[in-house]
Structure formats: C-alpha cells, structure tokens
From Swiss-Prot:
Topology in membrane: Peripheral membrane protein
Protein name as annotated: ATP synthase subunit alpha
Primary location class: membrane
GO CC terms: plasma membrane; proton-transporting ATP synthase complex
Claim: Nucleotide-binding is one of the keywords in the record: yes
Annotated PANTHER family: ATP SYNTHASE SUBUNIT ALPHA, MITOCHONDRIAL
Name of the gene encoding the protein in the UniProt record: atpA
EC number: 7.1.2.2
Pfam families in the record: ATP-synt_ab (PF00006), ATP-synt_ab_C (PF00306), ATP-synt_ab_N (PF02874)
Single GO MF descriptor: ADP binding
UniProt cross-references to CDD domains, sorted A to Z: ATP-synt_F1_alpha_C (cd18113), ATP-synt_F1_alpha_N (cd18116), F1-ATPase_alpha_CD (cd01132)
InterPro entries in alphabetical order: ATP_synth_asu-like_sf, ATP_synth_asu_C, ATP_synth_asu_C_sf, ATP_synth_F1_a_nt-bd_dom, ATP_synth_F1_asu, ATPase_a/bsu_AS, ATPase_F1/V1/A1_a/bsu_N, ATPase_F1/V1/A1_a/bsu_N_sf
Function: Produces ATP from ADP in the presence of a proton gradient across the membrane. The alpha chain is a regulatory subunit.
Length: 537
C-alpha cells in the first residue's frame, strides 16, 4: 500500500529538502595533463598559473611550474610520475613553493618540502616562508665583522670566516670536504652553552643540506651530529640520490629559507650546501627534459643565476631594527618578528674532477663566493689532514672578522708555509743547505705538524692561539717533528689544568698583551724541557 502525498504537503517537503542544500560553489582553475614522464608533466589549460607556483596532481602528487609557454606549461613533479597519466586533471593552488619554518625544525631531518622523514612525528610550526626570495639590498646589509669559528686551526688562522660570508669548500671526492663542514657545525656547540651566552656569545643555528648524497651517507652524518650533541641546534635537509631531480634542485633553496628565518629574527645561522655540483646536475636534467636550450657542458644558460641567487641570500643584516623591518621582499608572516643584527653564513661545497678548478661550475661558484678553501688529494694522501692547500685558498672578507690575537700570531704563518713548501721541493735535489734554509725547513715542518688535526675534534680559538704562538715563535724548533702533535695535546691539557688564566685572558680580551705573551713563552719553554726529558731518547 503506497502512501499518497497530499498536495498541501508538497511545498513543506520541498522547503525542507532545499534548506539542506549548500549553495556555495568551489571554483578551481584546472588544466589537463598532455604528456608525462621522467618527472616532468606538460599541462594544457592553466593559462593564469605563475612561474614557481605549486600545482596539485591526482594521488597527492605535488608539482611546481617552471616553464610558461604559449599553448602549455611545463611542471616538475615532486613525487612519482608513474601515478600520473595523460588526461588527468591538474589544479592550481595559487601558492608559490614554500616551506614551514621555526624552532621546531631544529633536531629534525626533513625533505626539501619541509616534511619530516626521521620518523619522529609531525612538526608543528605556524610560519611558512617562500623558497625563492630576492637577496637583501645593499642598504640592509652590514659589513662582515664578527668571526664564525670553525675550530680548525688551518682555517681560523689563515682563511678566517666571518658571519654573513660565503666561503666555498672545493676539492676532489674523498678529500674531507664534508668533514670540514661537520667539524664547523660541531664547533658551534660552544656558542649554545649557558656560560658562553652569559659572556655575550651569540649562538649559531646550523642547517646541513644534503643534495644527491647516498641515503647511508646522510644517516651517517646525522649519527655523527647526534653523537657530538650537535643535532640540538641543527636541521638536516635531505634530498638523496634516489629522490626525484626536482627535489634535489630545490633542496638548497629550502636550506636558505630556513636560514633566513633565523637571520631575519636577529639571530645567526650557518647553512652548508653539500654539494652544489649535484644540484647543478639535477637542474641540468630538469632543464633538458623541459626542452630548454643547452649551453656549455649541456648546462642551461641560467646555471650561473641558479647559484648566484642562492648564495646572495647569505648576508649580515644591519643592526638597525627599524631598517631591518623595511627589508625588500620581507614576507608578511615574519614582519612582526623581524629584527636587525642577524646573519646567514653559507658554506657551499663543490666537487672537482681530478683537481680541475677551471671547469664550468667550479669557476662560477668561485666567482660568486667571498673566498675558497681548496682541499687536495695529494696532501690528504700524504697524511696532512685537513688537506688544505693554503697557497690557493683565500678568504676575501674574513680578515676583518678575525680576533686580534689570532691575527697577530698567524700574521706570518701563510708566508712561512709558502716558503717551506718552496724550499722543501728544492731541498730534495741538494743536501748542502745553509743554516738559514735549514732553520726555515725546521720551522715549516713543525708548523705543518701543528696544523694537522683529527676529525670531529674542533679546537677552541684561545687554544689555537696558544699553540700557534708556540709554533710561530720557534719554541718547538728543537723538538723532533714526530713528537709535535703529542706535545700539543699534553701542552694544552697542562694549560687547561694549571694556567687557565692565560686561556681565559685570550678568550675574553681576544688578543695577547705583552705580559700574556711573556708568561705563555715561559710556560711553554719550561714544559718543553720536561716533555723532552720524558719523550726524547
């Protein structure tokens, strides 16, 4: 038996049905996939899309628009292209590529999109900053005056790095480039201690960007940083060799963005790009697939701009808070927190082939940066580690950031070593050397031994000044070269225990007055005699 609907009920039923109807309309700007493969998609229909804008593909795959052409747009995919097929719908997001930033990122391993990949749960942050951003203008910058200590004697003495500088680390594979960068991160631990901050030390937050590395290598780096307590103030951004080329291409920009968050809020950050050679290769792959015209070594014409726009973002910002808030391209999300006095220091790494620094990418990055640390296979294999070739390594702006005590003791160090290298080659041919030449060879040999340093044992700057003073003043000339490193360890331990006042004076004053020099010389000479009696047979 059917229930008849009475005519007077119809209007009430219709009114009830229509009351639940949602009249809002969702408007999407959509396009269609014309072609997909090798991490690239060509899309028809997204006529109003912007370059660098994120687009949404099916199966939660995100892409970024790089090519804008008359009849289609070219996008790179940050996920697998196997899931996407011809005819799929693509949505505009109207959002330029950005990552979440904040203190919650410290101690975590993330991918270049800011998503955690360390299995420690979600990261809660409120601020997002764009991956691409114009570098600060000239009026918002401040000269590099403050040192960034690496803890490596060879670098802090002869190739000093200042906060806000760009210093290239360049060398063949297996010469210790990553080790120099990791030692620098570990050395920043001293700036995070309570005692250091009470004395006015400004902590340095670190970002390590691993581009195109093996996943096992990245895991090893994270393990080393955790072991030395350095992950507390470090973020690792990883785009491994197995990740899509577009992720490898954007990874350094993600590192720069995170570093800018600390820089623009009045703090200090250090970002390490390991390495930009692999980023250039990933960008070349993406560009060729997008059918951009190739240039030298098949790199696209804008490969210089790829690195220059990244490295120019490293800067020391003016101390004027009001001026810092007016900085060009400062995102609205960070404006209320903006402060002056911050810095972003960049240590890009470039891998050379058979020591050829005149190749395309190495010469590009050398011309962009404020100096380079050149590591050599021959030095590495001969046992000099870190294997820094002091002759062609240079820091163009770090000299003004060096502490006075270090500048004084290391003033002649570069010249002494250069003369030693020259004489060493000459001495191989003849045995009859005059006394002055023999003295120079003896002094140089001791200095080379002093500059050797183990991995993951960065040294405080006051200890560096003390041991370099002993070496450059010729106090160790009578000690056999093979005992120099043993003497160094014992001497610094003795200073720490019995003459802490000398180290404290150097640390607080940043220089050595005549009294400190006299006292240090006496202590060193006395200890040398005792050491010789115990060790020289």
């Amino acid at each position: 038996m059917s229930t008849a609907v009475r005519p007077d009920e119809i209007s009430a039923i219709l009114r009830k049905q229509l009351s639940g109807f949602d009249s809002e309309v969702d408007v999407y700007d959509v396009g269609t996939v014309l072609q997909v493969g090798d991490g690239i998609a060509r899309i028809y229909g997204l006529s109003k899309v912007a370059a660098g804008e994120l687009v949404e593909f099916p199966h939660n795959v995100t892409g970024m628009v790089l090519n804008l052409e008359e009849d289609n747009v070219g996008a790179v995919l940050f996920g697998s292209s196997d899931l996407i097929k011809e005819g799929d719908t693509v949505k505009r997001t109207k959002i330029l590529a950005s990552i979440p930033v904040g203190e919650a990122m410290l101690g975590r391993v993330i991918n270049p999109l800011g998503e955690p990949i360390d299995g420690k749960g979600a990261i809660k942050t409120e601020i997002r900053l764009p991956l691409e951003r114009r570098a600060p203008g000239v009026i918002f910058r401040h000269p590099v005056k403050e040192p960034l200590q690496t803890g490596l004697k060879a670098i802090d003495s002869m190739i000093p790095i200042g906060r806000g500088q760009r210093e290239l680390i360049i060398g063949d594979r297996q010469t210790g480039k990553t080790a120099v960068a990791i030692d620098t991160i570990i050395n920043q631990k001293a700036s995070h201690t309570k005692e250091a901050q009470e004395k006015g030390a400004k902590p340095v937050y670190c970002i390590y960007v691993a581009t195109g590395q093996k996943a096992s290598t990245v895991a090893q780096v994270v393990n080393i940083l955790e072991k030395h307590g350095a992950m507390e103030y470090t973020t690792v951004i990883s785009a491994t060799a197995s990740d899509p080329a577009p992720l490898q291409f954007i990874s350094p920009y993600a590192g720069a963005t995170l570093g800018e968050y600390f820089r623009d809020t009045g703090r200090h950050a250090l970002v390490i790009y390991d390495d930009l050679s692999k980023q250039a290769v990933a960008y070349r792959q993406v560009s060729l697939l997008l059918r951009r015209p190739p240039g030298r070594e098949a790199y696209p014409g804008d490969v210089f701009y790829l690195h220059s726009r990244l490295l120019e973002r490293a800067a020391r910002i003016t101390n004027d808070d009001a001026l810092a808030k007016q900085m060009n391209d400062l995102p609205d999300s960070i404006k209320p927190m903006a402060k002056g006095g911050g810095s972003l220091t960049a240590l890009p790494i470039i891998e050379t082939q058979a020591g050829d620094v005149s190749a395309y990418i190495p010469t590009n990055v050398i011309s962009i940066t404020d100096g380079q640390i050149f590591l050599e296979s021959n030095l590495f294999n001969s046992g000099q580690r870190p294997a820094i070739n002091v002759g062609i390594s240079v820091s163009r702006v770090g000299g003004s950031a060096q502490i006075k005590g270090m500048k004084k003791v290391a003033g002649t160090l570069r010249l002494d070593l250069a003369q030693y290298r020259e004489l060493e080659a000459f001495a191989k041919f003849g045995s009859d050397l005059d006394k002055a030449t023999q003295a120079q060879l003896t002094r140089g040999g001791r200095l080379v031994e002093i500059l050797k340093q183990g991995q993951y044992v960065p040294m405080a700057v006051e200890k560096q000044v003390a041991i370099l003073f002993v070496g450059t003043q010729g106090i160790l000339d009578t000690l056999p070269a093979n005992l120099v490193r043993k003497f160094e360890v014992a001497f610094l331990e003795m200073l720490e225990l019995k003459h802490k006042d000398i180290l404290n004076t150097i640390a607080t004053a940043g220089q050595m007055d005549a009294d400190t020099q006299k006292k240090l010389r006496q202590v060193a000479e006395q200890f040398l005699e005792t050491f010789k009696q115990a060790n020289v047979k």
